[in-house]
């Protein structure tokens, strides 16, 4: 995890729009890269690729029913790069009759594109889409995937459904949509595949202590307490745990740099 300084400063533009469903003002931060945007007043999911902002779906929810721990519009730095939180969704899986919900945050940088933060019961992961495919080995039990010389063991597979959304997304998000998610772990990292129809997306997450997320985004108060042990949470006895904490400590330095690219 790099602790180098941020990218050269830039002045991101913000586009103002109005919801065709209720007329409320909308703010578009990722421009042409946004595929859908959600009105937080009438809960219409809109086609951001259509100049008319065609309504794709409406869902019933209270805006404050599941408020993001990191508010939309918050800016921070991860791996030496500044990002803005532009989207938020709640997803749920059902395992042996029990529902488990977690939160995902869409982050955007106009030069670097998108990355994601996930949170479940106080456990956080910094996640990015893989640009090359891992090697899957289904001939062993449990199955494994290999990526950049590291082997990840299958943890679980379940159908994950989206139940709440806010902000903008680089895909056509829908409340009620579902896909099959498989997790393969090698703490502190996890590789996940999401299968929807014939499309498969692979991503890699790295476990991050909540306190480092709070420092990175200059959030008030304390992060939620961790409950239980997460699938890719590193053991405190492992040497690489210290390396993770030291790497993320560099974020604090980045935030104090006068050349912070978001102003």
PLM features: what roles do these ranges have?
Residues 85:
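Short acidic-hydrophobic catalytic motif
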